[in-house]
Amino acid sequence: MSNAETRPPLPPFTRESAIVKVRLAEDGWNGRDPEKVSLAYTLDTKWRNRVEFANNREEAKGFLTRKWAKELDYRLIKELWAFTDNRIAVRYAYEWHDDSGNWFRSYGNENWEFAENGLMANRFACINDMPIKESERKFHWPLGRRPDDHPGLSDLGL
């Protein structure tokens, strides 16, 4: 296994390493770079995102490209829900707007399963979109990584 194929922290997870893994995933997705994000997944990764399926890394990259072309000014917060050995469950919320300026807060849960090298092999996501007014937004940091001092989901009452 080369370093390029390793994505620490590696399973089996502790509470601390699972929290780090979740934050790294959040940071990656907030970067909105499909090529870079896709490298966190195995070549044969399996995804279900809402009703869309991806059966490998290339399909996942295509999904991410379409997603971030539609979901503009995307800002995401993830929170650890549960973990064991090579699996992590998260809950999350993200805010975005469409090309007509309509704002949404999307709430979701994901189940992740990791290969021994720390790459994600399976990702199963359930997500609901809630229309919000721009004045109801809670995520206002500059695009990119959420600042360390920004409240998390529980702190925001979400």
Model segments located where?
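A beta-strand edge to alpha-helix "cap/lid" segment located at domain peripheries
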Residues: 2-13, 68-158
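A solvent-exposed, acidic/Ser-Thr-rich amphipathic alpha-helical stretch
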Residues: 17, 34-88
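Short, low-complexity N-terminal intrinsically disordered segments enriched in polar/charged residues
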Residues: 1-43, 153-158
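Hydrophobic alpha-helical core bundles mediating ligand binding, dimerization, or RNAP-core interactions
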Residues: 22, 41, 64, 92-94, ...
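Charged/polar, solvent-exposed surface patches and flexible loops
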Residues: 20, 24-27, 39, 62, ...
